[in-house]
Each structure stands twice: as structure tokens, then as C-alpha cells.
Amino acid sequence: MNPQVSNIIIMLVMMQLSRRIDMEDPTIIMYIRILYCSSIGISWIIYQMARKRIVAKNDMTTMKYVEPGNAMSGEGEKLQVTTVRDYDLKEIDSAIKSIYTGMAMMGFMHLYLKYTNPLFMQSISPVKSALEHNEVKIHLFGKPATGDLKRPFKAPSLFGGMGQTGPKTDKKSIEEAERAGNAGVKAE
């Protein structure tokens, strides 16, 4: 099933469950906090296990790709030269940072604004996201890096595939970027 569709289904189910729970009861609020914190902890452990496997594997295969430019800032496409290990670590570190960002937002909404419902709604999402992350699929579940799991990963489009949203890996695009002087320096 498509991850976006399953996210919507899970959110609808969680909304129905949250209507049946007394969000004013301090005992239930404590259980919701424990559920959310354990969910965050489990997802953090999953990402750390994947990170450990990436470092242990130490795949120094060089990869080149053309990163799409940012239309908002007017930047053009840029050639990126990196290793599989560095790319994977960058992806995992980005996922870990997203956990911290989500915790900050939930902390603000729950502790400062006194909302408990979003805390309950987000109690499943971090673990689901961690288990669906491409790096986790490759390094923890042992799936081959082909098809959708081929590096560099394409970002999922909000509008279901209208326009290209991922980096270009074809030889022509890489050669054009090298000739245009948009080459990046290999990070070591």
C-alpha cells in the first residue's frame, strides 16, 4: 500500500480513537505521553541501528548525480559527487533531525498550548516512518538497492508524479553539469 494512503487511514483511525478517549484524565494523559515517548525512542533506535550498519558496511563506491535546483532561490542544478556511505549517512542524519523537529513541535503543542490530541495522533507516525525509510529497508531489512530503493532516492511528489522531483542520474545530465561548471567537490 502507498505510504501516503496508509498515513491517511491511520490518521482517520486515530481520530476516531481519540474521540473515545477522555483527554482530560491525568492518568490517560500520562499513558499518551509514555506512548509518544516510547514511539520516538523506538524510531530513534531503528535509525541508529541503520546508521551503525552503514558505518560498518563502509561502502566507498563513488556516485554522481545532478541535484535539482531550487526554484524559489533561483539556484540552478548542481552536480554532486559523493560516496554511497556518505549519501546514506546524510539521509539517516536527516531522518534523525526530523525526529527532533517533530519532538519540538509536539512539545510546544502539548506543554505550552496544552493540546493532548496531536500527541496521541502522532504516537504511531514516527515508527511507521522509520520502518518505511529507504535506508532502513536497505540496511536493516536487506532489500536490494534497485528500483525505488536505487540511490539517489527520488522525493515523493505531492501531486502523484507530476514533474520530476528527484535527482538526475543519467549520463547526459551529469556530463552537461560537468561542462557547465556546476560540479561539486567530492566530500571525503
From Swiss-Prot:
InterPro entries listed in its UniProt record: SND3_fun
Which ranges does the record mark as transmembrane? 27-47
Q: Which GO terms describe its cellular component?
A: endoplasmic reticulum; endoplasmic reticulum membrane; membrane; mitochondrion
Localization of this protein: Endoplasmic reticulum membrane; Mitochondrion
Q: Tell me how this protein sits in the membrane.
A: Single-pass membrane protein
**Signal peptide per UniProt:** none
Keyword Phosphoprotein on entry: yes
Q: Which GO terms describe its biological process?
A: phosphate ion transport; protein maturation; protein targeting to ER; protein transport
Q: Which keywords does the record carry? A: Endoplasmic reticulum, Membrane, Mitochondrion, Phosphate transport, Phosphoprotein, Protein transport, Transmembrane, Transmembrane helix, Transport
Q: Which Pfam families match?
A: Pho88
Q: Where is the composition biased (Basic and acidic residues)?
A: 168-179
Domain of life (superkingdom): Eukaryota
Q: Please explain the role this protein plays, according to its UniProt record.
A: Functions in the SND pathway, a SRP (signal recognition particle) and GET (guided entry of tail-anchored proteins) independent pathway for targeting a broad range of substrate proteins to the endoplasmic reticulum. SND functions in parallel to GET in targeting proteins with downstream hydrophobic motifs. Involved in inorganic phosphate uptake. Also involved in telomere length regulation and maintenance.
Misc remark? Present with 61800 molecules/cell in log phase SD medium.
Q: What binding partners and quaternary form does the record give? A: Interacts with ENV10/SND2. ENV10/SND2 and PHO88/SND3 form a complex with the translocon in the endoplasmic reticulum membrane.
Q: What is this protein called?
A: SRP-independent targeting protein 3
This chain is encoded by the gene named: PHO88
